[in-house]
From Swiss-Prot:
HEAT repeats lie at residues 350-388, 389-427, 507-545. Interacts with GORAB. Interacts with COPA, COPB1 and COPB2. Homooligomer. Interacts with AP2B1. This is N-terminal kinase-like protein. The lineage of its organism: Eukaryota, Metazoa, Chordata, Craniata, Vertebrata. It comes from Homo sapiens. It is linked to Spinocerebellar ataxia, autosomal recessive, 21: A form of spinocerebellar ataxia, a clinically and genetically heterogeneous group of cerebellar disorders due to degeneration of the cerebellum with variable involvement of the brainstem and spinal cord. SCAR21 is characterized by cerebellar atrophy and ataxia with onset in early childhood. Patients also manifest recurrent episodes of liver failure, hepatic fibrosis and a peripheral neuropathy.
Length: 808
């Protein structure tokens, strides 16, 4: 019934790739590349075609087929499947390359290192030790043709054709009959008298010496060449000489050879071998050992082969995160290995892990993800960012740890181009409004302003019109000087997003107010920005036809190209604020401040741009900010430098009062009335339903420190404020000011989202005078209360000695 017969080769689940065999191995087998039919995964297929009159070779091939199926060891070629018919033998193994071809390719690429060879020889010797000491088997074919390399660079021992038992129960060693293989036989095999005393491993260790010589010097021409070590490293030469010694009795056991080479200073005593040995036993290591290993791994990855990192280190890192408790220490080596992957491999292997990491509550992991986002952001698609990453990232805006808040703000620069309309224009702006108004850390408020300036072009036209002017105006009233600089530079960076009316009526009045700022850096930037905006206005005034060209971006949709230009306007104006992050790790103060150049955003053609000037150290160096924000009368203990919850980061209200006192030299009463006015308008707008989240103007709690400077002494009795004088005419005149109706502007209520017009330009002169007078009376009342309390304490406590208070 021959028509019921089936071709076993056709039903075999693996197929050969139609290519010539690899290598031309001496012996009965031909090595082909293949793949699994179901999945397409690559494999190697050793093929032996049965030929008439070659019974001896057929028996050798069948014996090897049997050995492949029964021997299992990490350093021996892994058997996957096999096929035995009357016409052929197929042995399917993991995908490998002959060692000779691999070494030649590595040398041509200029990437072969002694580290790779040391670990490869370690694996071959370990396989021989397993065969001789554990299985009592003699390999009898150790040579270059019997060693293969997998895709991770691991060396595997194959060539099991001529293996026999060391106990003699299976007969003597089979005859090879192949001159290419017989040249590796030790000299004692030529002595037929049998009087030579040798160990069971002696012949294989001689062949190991031949393999070492060929790895470093190329194909062995004759046995006499073994006397010259050639390019064999000096640390390996003494052990090599033991292997090729004429006396087989002194050749070391494979286990002892490994021990000798692993001694301090030995050829196999290096970081690469130690890393591989740890990875082989990582499942039984203690958690503390794993933590230490992954922490030190990043330093060594640069010296390791790329294939090893991709195919051996990466799976262990992914496993450690998925099933272990390695935590944040996995991130740094994970992203370092990720650089070796293609975009497709990165999407398949690393992105799922990254997405899962963002949902972690571990602060260390969250902050490291934010710090290293630049390495993987290009592999994230928009749906993944908006649905799986952004909802977890925004929790960082509410974190009590300043370092996490700071890194969350910075990460928005990378995420903004991938955010959808709702997340970018609604959710993100809500958090930015709260941070800029209420965050107690001046550097974080400053970086929020900087980030807004960089992502401004990604916002929708309506959001830009509603947000940018109000946000940057608020920043110019921040008591933290770098925040005021950031507000000015924010206007300059986004100058193309404002209409000429907004430039003249909203932006220039704000900038002009900063020309009398106590900080010279603020004044300098204000003057430059004013000149830039005036230049635009003047050019449009001279040639009104330029108006359309100048305002082309005002109502334009969000543009990534515009965002790229804005992103370079000043770098991170508070780049040094990363000290908040480093402060989480280090307890030592930062170094002295340095000056940083802040380049301006390029202006439209025909409009002169302000010349880039170095910004003083104050807005660019974290160490100075920390000193500026600390209470100068309080000395902190250095041991508490990294305790965020307990650390005194300074009182912005106290700092604001001292700044206000300095401002009195620039304008009498004007700053006080301005701050009072803003505070009052903020109080009104805070009653809107969305004031807790979506209001830049409603959340000005930090500005109240400008309103009540307790250190300022009240003016003498009878003193009149400058605003109380009638500068327009005689005091006895009862006529109203004929220009009053022109100068007075109706006060407008803030819109429900409170992103609208700033209230600083809408209050009348009379209300400013009344509020200034109320502020003065409030300070006087506060001073009296403090004096009364001091008097009460003196009466209650009694007399006090010099330097000590009397105990109750």
């Amino acid at each position: 019934m021959w028509f019921f017969a089936r071709d076993p080769v056709r039903d075999f689940p693996f197929e050969l790739i139609p290519e010539p065999p690899e290598g031309g191995l001496p012996g009965p087998w031909a090595l082909h590349r293949g793949r699994k039919k179901a999945t397409g995964s690559p494999v190697s297929i050793f093929v032996y075609d049965v030929k008439p009159g070659a019974e001896e070779q057929t028996q050798v091939a069948k014996a090897a087929f049997k050995r492949f199926k029964t021997l299992r060891h990490p350093n021996i070629l892994a058997y996957i499947d096999g096929l035995e018919t009357e016409k052929c033998l197929h042995v399917v193994t993991e995908a490998v390359t002959p060692l000779g071809i691999y070494l030649k390719a590595r040398v041509e690429a200029g990437g072969l290192k002694e580290l790779e060879i040391s670990w490869g020889l370690h694996q071959i010797v370990k396989a021989l030790s397993f065969l001789v000491n554990d299985c009592s088997l003699i390999h009898n074919n150790v040579c270059m043709a019997a060693v293969f390399v997998d895709r991770a660079g691991e060396w595997k021992l194959g060539g099991l054709d001529y293996m026999y038992s060391a106990q003699g129960n299976g007969g003597g060693p089979p005859r090879k009959g192949i001159p290419e293989l017989e040249q590796y036989d030790p000299p004692e095999l030529a002595d037929s008298s049998g009087r030579v005393v040798r160990e069971k491993w002696s012949a294989d260790m001689w062949r190991l010496g031949c393999l070492i010589w060929e790895v470093f010097n190329g194909p062995l021409p004759r046995a006499a060449a073994l006397r010259n070590p050639g390019k064999i490293p000096k640390t390996l030469v003494p052990h090599y000489c033991e292997l090729v010694g004429a006396n087989p009795k002194v050749r070391p056991n494979p286990a002892r050879f490994l021990q000798n080479c692993r001694a301090p200073g030995g050829f196999m005593s290096n970081r690469f071998v130690e890393t591989n040995l740890f990875l082989e036993e990582i499942q039984i290591k203690e958690p503390a050992e794993k933590q230490k290993f992954f922490q030190e791994l990043s330093k060594s990855l640069d010296a390791f082969p790329e294939d090893f990192c991709r195919h051996k280190v990466l799976p262990q890192l992914l496993t450690a995160f998925e099933f272990g408790n390695a935590g944040a220490v996995v991130l740094t080596p994970l992203f370092k290995v990720g650089k070796f992957l293609s975009a497709e491999e990165y999407q398949q292997k690393i992105i799922p892990v990254v997405v899962k990491m963002f949902s972690s509550t571990d602060r260390a992991m969250r902050i490291r993800l934010l710090q290293q986002m630049e390495q993987f952001i290009q592999y994230l698609d928009e749906p993944t960012v908006n649905t799986q990453i952004f909802p977890h990232v925004v929790h960082g805006f509410l974190d009590t740890n300043p370092a996490i808040r700071e890194q969350t703000v910075k990460s928005m620069l990378l995420l903004a181009p991938k955010l959808n309309e709702a997340n970018l224009n609604v959710e993100l702006m809500k958090h930015f409004a709260r941070l800029q108004a209420k965050d107690e850390q001046g550097p974080i408020r400053c970086n929020t302003t900087v980030c807004l300036g960089k992502i401004g072009s990604y916002l929708s036209a309506s959001t830009r019109h509603r947000v940018l002017t109000s946000a940057f105006s608020r920043a110019t009233r921040d008591p933290f000087a770098p925040s005021r600089v950031a507000g000015v530079l924010g206007f300059a960076a986004t100058h193309n997003l404002y209409s000429m009316n907004d430039c003249a009526q909203k932006i220039l009045p704000v900038l002009c107010g900063l020309t009398v700022d106590p900080e010279k850096s603020v004044r300098d930037q204000a003057f430059k920005a004013i000149r830039s905006f005036l230049s635009k206005l003047e050019s449009v005034s001279e040639d009104p036809t330029q108006l359309e060209e100048v305002e082309k971006d005002v109502h334009a949709a969000s543009s990534p190209g515009m965002g790229g230009a804005a992103a370079s306007w000043a770098g991170w104006a508070v780049t040094g604020v990363s000290s908040l992050t480093s402060k989480l790790i280090r307890s030592h103060p930062t170094t002295a401040p340095t000056e940083t150049n802040i380049p301006q955003r390029p202006t439209p053609e025909g409009v002169p741009a302000p010349a880039p000037t170095p910004v003083p150290a104050t807005p660019t160096t974290s160490g100075h900010w920390e000193t500026q924000e600390e209470d100068k009368d309080t000395a902190e203990d250095s041991s508490t430098a990294d305790r965020w919850d307990d650390e005194d980061w300074g009182s912005l209200e106290q700092e604001a009062e001292s700044v206000l006192a300095q401002q009195d030299d620039w304008s009498t009463g004007g700053q006080v009335s301005r701050a009072s006015q803003v505070s009052n308008s903020d109080h009104k707008s805070s009653k809107s339903p969305e004031s807790d989240w979506s209001s830049w103007e409603a959340e000005g709690s930090w500005e109240q420190g400008w309103q009540e400077p307790s250190s300022q002494e009240p003016p003498p009795d009878g003193t009149r404020l400058a605003s109380e004088y009638n500068w327009g005419g005689p005091e006895s005149s009862d006529k109203g000011d004929p220009f009053a109706t022109l100068s007075a502007r109706p006060s407008t209520q803030p819109r429900p989202d409170s992103w609208g017009e700033d209230n600083w330009e809408g209050l009348e002169t009379d209300s400013r005078q009344v509020k200034a007078e109320l502020a003065r009376k409030k300070r006087e009342e506060r001073r009296r209360e403090m004096e009364a309390k001091r008097a009460e304490r003196k009466v209650a406590k009694g007399p006090m000695k010099l330097g000590a208070r009397k105990l109750d």
